[in-house]
A protein has these predicted regions:
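The feature captures the beta-strand-to-loop junction immediately N-terminal to the Walker
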Residues: 31-33
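Helix-to-loop junction immediately C-terminal to a conserved catalytic motif
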Residues: 46
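Q-loop/switch helix immediately C-terminal to the Walker
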Residues: 78-92
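Conserved ABC ATPase "signature" region
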Residues: 95-112
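Conserved ABC ATPase signature
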Residues: 116-120
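Hydrophobic anchor residue at the start of the ABC signature
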Residues: 130
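Catalytic Walker B motif of ABC-type/P-loop ATPase nucleotide-binding domains
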Residues: 141-145
């Protein structure tokens, strides 16, 4: 993905990205203080917001193969299982129940499979949101502060699963987190934002 001369005005705030390359199959981090424009950039990449100027070249990537996780997951009224398979129904896809059970067990949620999703703890909800994001095998996954305010065990499960995915069938990630150690441990490249602009990147 290549972003060139991107501009998006949001009242008194202006997002201006001269050049940004998101390499496929890599874990990219996006860092910066609150209010620097990270979420606006992510929503523009996802097509939720329309840019005022510039281009986002997806280089053949289908937006239907992209997904975005927020800090506070939105869960459906229904069971844990129903929440996981919801993205599959939207895309007319099928995954065997054995695969769903495997993911639930890996995330420590198999015992809660038939419980109402909204009865889960905050950490369990984030793990469920993560499983729902990966179940349809997207090519591009955005995580906007998904790892924030999580208990250490849940955070470790998610980060370990990200690493496992990258070892077997790499996808592209764009991860926003204020946790410096976790970001440095996970990411291949980190892009730093300030006042709506990319000011630096490290690999």
């Amino acid at each position: 993905m290549k972003i060139t001369d991107l501009k998006k005005n949001m009242g008194s705030f202006s997002l201006e990205i001269d050049h940004l390359v998101i390499e496929p199959g890599k874990i990219h981090g996006l860092a910066g203080h609150n209010g620097c424009g990270k979420t606006i950039l992510l929503k523009t990449i996802m097509g939720i917001l329309e840019p005022d100027k510039g281009t986002i070249d997806l280089e053949g990537l289908d937006r239907r193969s992209m997904t975005m996780m927020m800090q506070r997951p939105y869960l459906l009224h229904g069971s844990v299982y129903e929440n996981i398979i919801y993205p599959l129904k939207l895309r007319n896809m099928e995954v065997g129940e054995a695969e769903v059970d495997r993911l639930l067990e890996r995330a420590g949620l198999l015992a809660q499979k038939n419980q109402y999703a909204r009865s889960l703890s905050s950490g369990e909800r984030q793990k469920l949101s993560f499983l729902r994001a990966i179940i349809f095998r997207p090519e591009f996954i955005i995580m906007d502060e998904t790892l924030s305010n999580m208990d250490p065990d849940s955070e470790k499960i998610i980060t370990d699963m990200i690493k496992e995915i990258q070892e077997t069938d790499p996808v592209t990630w764009l991860i926003v987190t204020h946790q410096t150690q976790r970001r440095d441990d996970l990411c291949d490249v980190i892009h730093y934002m300030e006042k709506g602009r990319i000011i630096n990147e490290t690999a």
